[in-house]
Regions:
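N-terminal export signals
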Residues: 1-19
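A cross-kingdom marker for long, charged
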Residues: 22-41, 45-322
């Protein structure tokens, strides 16, 4: 038991919960299976769903992404979950996020909702061991999932979302304290390297809806400068941006993103756009920008605070609810 006491184990068993032990070597997917096995019948009724479950409000749940939503009602911090189960949810989260980023995500969650588990909810979609199973965690500025490759062709198990509001909603131009703002600074370093003609192609006036992250494939034009129009040093800088974007996530997810990207043409089939709309402080450090390919979208909305929408696959023919 995570909490340890034999008396607590007896109480858990009496209420219909299974005791939980976290193996020293485990994946998020295996821990999600343990969480599923630990649930009492009433818990399963509240947070477990069939693989193709269509939510009356959100649609197909396993492909839903949002900036501020809850797939289920019970908060992770609530007494709906046992202490063991809460620790198990945290262990899943910690294995999805690289250790170097745990403190930064904790700061984001403290600022946005009062800390880990406060306002966060969990859904378990499908059945462990069936080949169709997904762990989904949602809340303010969070859509995070893992599925052990249950969803064909898709990175991260499906679209994800992250963001941060340091406080008050409207941040200053330098976004002090925002844990994700360095990603935008990295992208802006690419813009600074562009010459006048390149900047004219990269800078776009019309900002799309932030949740418009459906794939365009090769049928629709994508705004921004083609990566093939970058010089070798500019492209190398863009590679650094991609590495910084992927840095918070576990190795398996980083590799899956790169694999999906390679199978649909790599960075050379992408475009990079910066948006003149929403330039906080009119300092030409572009708060809003987007890296996009036929089936790759990383949309960074920095104004008035950071929202980031991510949708990556190796095929553009995939469903999305955003």
């Amino acid at each position: 038991l995570l909490g340890g006491a034999a008396g607590a184990a007896g109480l858990v068993a009496a209420r219909g919960f299974a005791a939980v032990t976290i193996p020293p070597v485990s994946t998020p997917e295996s821990l999600a299976g343990l969480l599923h096995a630990s649930l009492a019948p009433a818990q399963r009724e509240a947070i477990c769903f069939p693989w193709d479950y269509v939510h009356p409000q959100f649609g197909l749940l396993r492909t839903r992404v949002g900036a501020n939503w809850n797939a289920t009602e019970p908060a992770v911090i609530s007494d709906f979950y046992t202490a063991d189960q809460k620790e198990l949810v945290r262990a899943i989260f910690d294995r999805l996020i690289e250790p170097e980023w745990h403190a930064r995500f904790d700061r984001q969650m403290e600022d946005d909702c009062g800390g880990f588990g406060h306002g966060h909810s969990v859904a378990l979609i499908g059945e462990p061991g069936s080949g169709k199973f997904q762990f989904l965690m949602t809340g303010r500025h969070m859509t995070l999932r893992c599925d052990g490759d249950s969803s064909d062709h898709v990175a991260f198990g499906g679209p994800i979302f992250y963001g941060h509001d340091v406080g008050g909603g409207d941040e200053e131009k330098d976004h002090p304290g925002n844990v994700f703002w360095p990603q935008a600074l990295a992208a802006n370093r690419v813009f600074e390297m562009l010459d006048g003609r390149q900047r004219g192609e990269a800078l776009v006036a019309r900002l799309p809806r932030e949740n418009a992250i459906g794939f365009r494939g090769r049928r629709e034009p994508i705004p921004g400068i083609p990566v093939t129009a970058l010089s070798p040093d500019q492209r190398e800088e863009l590679e650094q941006v991609l590495a910084i974007l992927l840095e918070p996530y576990r190795t398996a997810d980083r590799e899956e993103v790169r694999g999906c990207l390679d199978r649909q043409g790599g960075l050379d089939d992408c475009r990079l756009a910066f948006y003149s709309t929403g330039d906080i402080g009119a300092d030409q450090v572009w708060d809003n920008w987007r890296l996009e390919g036929p089936s790759f979208v990383w949309h960074f909305r920095g104004a008035p605070h950071v929202h980031v929408w991510v949708h990556v696959a190796d095929s553009p023919d995939l469903p999305l609810n955003s």
